[in-house]
Structure formats: C-alpha cells, structure tokens
C-alpha cells in the first residue's frame, strides 16, 4: 500500500469545499489515514515549499498558503501518488481534465484548491512535516 500527502489549500477551505473534495477522494478509493485542520505561518509555508525558493512564484505561494486554514491529509491506496495526481488534475485548472478536482473547483493556477505529492519519496517527507507517526491511524 502506498501513501501520499494532500493539502486542501486555503481557497478550498474558504469556499467550504472540504466535504465535497474529501468525498471525491474517498470515492476514488483512497483511505484517509491522517487529517487535521491547521494554519501555516509564512515561516512554515516557506519551509514546506523551500524546494521552490528560487522559482518566481515562491513568494506568492507562501503568501497564499499562509492566508487561511488548510487541511493536510495522508492518503493510502495502491499506486496512491500517481492515482492522486490524476484525480486532482493539472496545476492549471484550464489544462485539467474534465471531472478532476481542479477542473471542478479551482479558479486559477495560483489558487488551485489542492496539493498532491509528486513522488513517494516526497510524500514521506511532506507527511512527516505535518504528522507525527502516532497521528497516522489505519482502520481496516
């Protein structure tokens, strides 16, 4: 069983889409094994997205991710990383396939509702950023 990390971003929370998006995730066969609502500071958002520090969108991303509450989750499923990337769709909702989370709910490339880990290795690193081992609970 593979795990991935997602974050329902501040725009998702503001639009009151937590339930709708979580429902899509569960209906796609993912198990939620950890979940919390939190608010990132500029410092914690900067640390989480440090890999993008030299990219032109970094400052805007940090501002956005610290603008309100978000909901990180660890998801579990066979082929979780790739399947989840398919479910959420392209970063730019205009390029996302019909029926994907971003096509349905995102407004722009910058405010695109949801984060999904891009590899199993990054999923493990990102999951540890938000969750201690004892917070991850698998229910069979």
Swiss-Prot record:
SUPFAM superfamilies: Nucleoside diphosphate kinase, NDK
Catalysed reactions listed for this entry: a 2'-deoxyribonucleoside 5'-diphosphate + ATP = a 2'-deoxyribonucleoside 5'-triphosphate + ADP; a ribonucleoside 5'-diphosphate + ATP = a ribonucleoside 5'-triphosphate + ADP
Protein name as it appears in the record: Nucleoside diphosphate kinase
PANTHER family with a match to the protein in the record: NUCLEOSIDE DIPHOSPHATE KINASE, NUCLEOSIDE DIPHOSPHATE KINASE DDB_G0292928-RELATED
Cofactor field: Mg(2+)
Enzyme Commission designation: 2.7.4.6
Ribonucleoprotein listed as a keyword: no
Family affiliation: Belongs to the NDK family.
GO cellular component: cytoplasm
Organism: Chlorobaculum tepidum (strain ATCC 49652 / DSM 12025 / NBRC 103806 / TLS) (Chlorobium tepidum)
Compartment annotation: Cytoplasm
Residues bound to ATP: 9, 57, 85, 91, 102, 112
GO biological process, one term: UTP biosynthetic process
SMART domains: NDK
Main location: cytoplasm
SUBUNIT field: Homotetramer.
InterPro entries given in the database record: NDK-like_dom, NDK-like_dom_sf, Nucleoside_diP_kinase
Function of the molecule: Major role in the synthesis of nucleoside triphosphates other than ATP. The ATP gamma phosphate is transferred to the NDP beta phosphate via a ping-pong mechanism, using a phosphorylated active-site intermediate.
EC class (word): transferase
Keywords assigned: ATP-binding, Cytoplasm, Kinase, Magnesium, Metal-binding, Nucleotide metabolism, Nucleotide-binding, Phosphoprotein, Transferase
Coiled coil: none
Active site: 115 (pros-phosphohistidine intermediate)
One Gene Ontology molecular-function label: nucleoside diphosphate kinase activity
């Amino acid at each position: 069983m593979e795990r991935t990390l997602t974050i329902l971003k501040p725009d998702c929370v503001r639009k009151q889409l937590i339930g709708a998006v979580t429902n899509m995730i569960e209906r796609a066969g993912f198990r939620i094994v950890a979940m919390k609502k939190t608010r990132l500071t500029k410092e914690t958002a900067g640390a989480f997205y440090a890999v993008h520090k030299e990219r032109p969108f970094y400052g805007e991303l940090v501002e956005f991710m610290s603008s309100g509450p978000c909901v990180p989750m660890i998801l579990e499923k066979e082929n979780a990383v790739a399947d989840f990337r398919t479910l959420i769709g392209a970063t730019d909702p205009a390029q996302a396939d019909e029926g994907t989370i971003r096509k349905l709910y995102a407004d722009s490339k910058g405010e695109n509702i949801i984060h999904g880990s891009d590899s199993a290795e990054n999923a493990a690193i990102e999951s540890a950023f938000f969750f201690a081992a004892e917070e991850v609970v698998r229910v069979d």
